[in-house]
């Protein structure tokens, strides 16, 4: 075991004190939040009925940050609550009708991806819970052709048979009731079809169709069943996380083969379409089969509702998963090719470089500033010379945003983290912890003043108030830009364990800061803000997929450095009031990924 000791007292930096205050505060707030909004059995204090296919994801999102927070260093109480609440949400939305066999009956993979973050967090929290492993395998079976009741996978054509899918299988014909609780939301977006009667999408491609008008909605639903219900879309690539999750639990090669084959199928479709990823293929795998031959216009595709986002994000998620499984970064090239296409279509408007975000019958439209988050993630995941060039290309457009927001619970904007990692924003750690604390307190203040009628609350009510925010903690303690919220796994260069308590996460009183993240190394600072000695075991890779290759001491507490070549973990003993700062060399993707804790998992 590679051991580093820190024995020289030093003042604790502000970021470290704030980090520990944030963790301690969220431990308390999680309990108060659950007490305020749930019954004794954990069910949400809400309405008795909830129709339609939307909403279970929002129930899970209301507590979905809890297991990840525990894995970062949250309390055992939060861990216990995370499991109670998952079971309660599952039972409640089963009664409503959205969940079947403990999984969403049918919906799209943007929403599956959001709710599945809860499941992926359980793997990091405790890999030895038998029901977690059983669910991982059972849910993956629904997508790889091993579940007779959920025939989502077409092995012959290498496609998921519908954009709307789940534990009941593909939803090949949608009903008005399926959409009844989501029409208000979609009424704010551009029309999904350019030939809806009464909509002039030719002169105004962003024209809105009123989903709340019954006649208009009937026309939309008819076209949706004709054009979008059958066949595959890139959004379904997010299912690779669920199958990779099963692989991390088991190491079974069938899961790996499925992920790689499915991503390859979309790569081949892209090549067949002249280099642009089509946003739809029909039941036989033909591009535009249900869309009058058009490669655009599919469900969550290049046109509707979000545009390029719904193509690029699944390609990022699937490429990252494939790299995790193989160590081969070329699986992210498909993402890069689409980013390059959009960049090359860019133009200057009012002195600013803009790229298209959507494609319709009239071509590309909805130009705006290029989205930089994908490139930050790409560079953190792979970090080769081409990725560095991509990063520089975006950076040339202007400084990285330093805005710290909390749109989703496990996500924080990656651009401020990138500025810090490059060295241009050294105050980011302190500011990130301070802003996180302020956001937690702001949410607790909202909760204290929340005296409305629960029967009237929106289905997003609780997730918008959940005070357990993990985004900045992932950035600072694990050295990753964030988790891709709509279904990404927690790809990161390191994670920590508490060997004294035999649990994941930072020990009590210990704060961590990862900086200068490079493909071959990171800088790690650990601070013990308390008075008692603490021991931290730091693992190479969130899933033990990396190995450490060297240690360089960067502080004044020098001493003989042990050889850590090919080590999965490094042990730090830190006296009270002391800290340690090291550069850890690493070789990435040297091991099979596993949820197993240090000493428990496979060694290759």
Where are these regions (language model features)?
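Glycan-recognition and catalytic cores of secretory/periplasmic carbohydrate-active enzymes
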Residues: 1-559, 564-604
């Amino acid at each position: 075991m590679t051991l580093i000791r820190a024995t020289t007292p030093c003042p604790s930096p502000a970021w470290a004190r704030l980090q520990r205050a944030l963790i301690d505060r969220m431990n308390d707030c999680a309990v108060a939040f659950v007490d305020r909004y749930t019954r004794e059995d954990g069910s949400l204090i809400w309405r008795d009925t909830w129709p339609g296919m939307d909403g279970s994801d929002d129930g899970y999102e209301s507590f979905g940050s809890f297991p990840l927070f525990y894995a970062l260093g949250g309390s055992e109480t939060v861990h216990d609550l995370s499991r109670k609440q998952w079971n309660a949400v599952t039972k409640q939305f089963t009664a409503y009708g959205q969940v079947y066999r403990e999984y969403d009956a049918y919906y799209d993979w943007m929403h599956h991806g959001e709710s599945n973050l809860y499941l992926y967090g359980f793997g990091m929290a405790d890999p030895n819970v038998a029901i977690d492993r059983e669910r991982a395998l059972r849910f993956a079976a629904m997508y790889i052709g091993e579940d007779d009741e959920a025939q989502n996978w077409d092995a012959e054509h290498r496609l998921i048979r519908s954009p709307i899918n789940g534990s009941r299988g593909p939803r090949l014909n949608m009903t008005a009731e399926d959409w009844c609780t989501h029409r208000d939301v979609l009424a704010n977006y551009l029309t999904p079809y350019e030939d809806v009667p009464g909509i002039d999408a030719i002169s105004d491609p962003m024209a809105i169709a009123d989903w709340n008008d019954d006649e208009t909605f009937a026309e939309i639903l008819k076209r949706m069943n004709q054009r979008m219900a059958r066949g595959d879309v890139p959004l379904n690539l997010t299912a690779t996380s669920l199958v990779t999750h099963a692989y991390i639990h088991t190491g079974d090669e069938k899961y790996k083969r499925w992920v790689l084959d499915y991503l390859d199928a979309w790569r081949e479709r892209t090549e067949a379409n002249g280099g642009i990823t089509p946003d739809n293929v029909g039941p036989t795998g033909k591009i535009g089969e249900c869309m009058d031959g058009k490669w655009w216009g599919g469900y969550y595709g290049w046109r509707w509702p979000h545009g390029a986002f719904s193509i690029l994000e699944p390609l990022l998620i699937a490429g990252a998963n494939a790299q995790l499984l193989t160590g081969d970064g070329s699986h992210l090239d498909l993402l890069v090719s689409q980013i390059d296409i959009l960049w090359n279509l860019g133009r200057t408007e009012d002195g600013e470089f803009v790229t298209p975000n959507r494609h319709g019958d009239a071509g590309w439209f909805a130009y705006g500033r290029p989205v930089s988050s994908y490139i930050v993630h790409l560079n953190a995941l792979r970090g080769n010379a081409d990725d560095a060039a991509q990063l520089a290309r975006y950076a040339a457009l202007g400084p990285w945003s330093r805005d710290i927001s909390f749109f989703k619970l496990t996500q924080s904007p990656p651009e401020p983290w990138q500025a810090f990692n490059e060295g241009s924003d050294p105050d980011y750690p302190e500011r990130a912890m301070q802003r996180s604390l302020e956001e937690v307190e702001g949410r607790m203040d909202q909760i204290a003043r929340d005296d409305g009628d629960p029967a009237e609350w929106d289905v997003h009510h609780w997730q918008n108030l959940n005070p357990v925010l993990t985004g900045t903690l992932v950035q600072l303690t694990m050295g990753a830009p964030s988790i891709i919220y709509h279904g990404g796994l927690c790809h990161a260069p390191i994670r920590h364990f508490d060997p004294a308590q035999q649990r994941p996460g930072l020990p009590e009183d210990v704060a961590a800061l990862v900086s200068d993240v490079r493909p071959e190394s990171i800088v790690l600072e650990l601070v013990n803000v308390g008075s008692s000695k603490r021991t931290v075991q730091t693992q190479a890779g969130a899933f033990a997929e990396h190995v450490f290759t060297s240690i360089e001491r960067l502080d004044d507490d020098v001493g003989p450095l042990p050889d850590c070549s090919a080590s999965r973990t490094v042990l730090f003993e830190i006296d009270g009031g002391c800290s340690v700062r090291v550069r850890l060399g690493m070789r990435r993707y040297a091991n099979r990924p596993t949820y197993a804790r240090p000493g428990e998992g496979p060694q290759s």
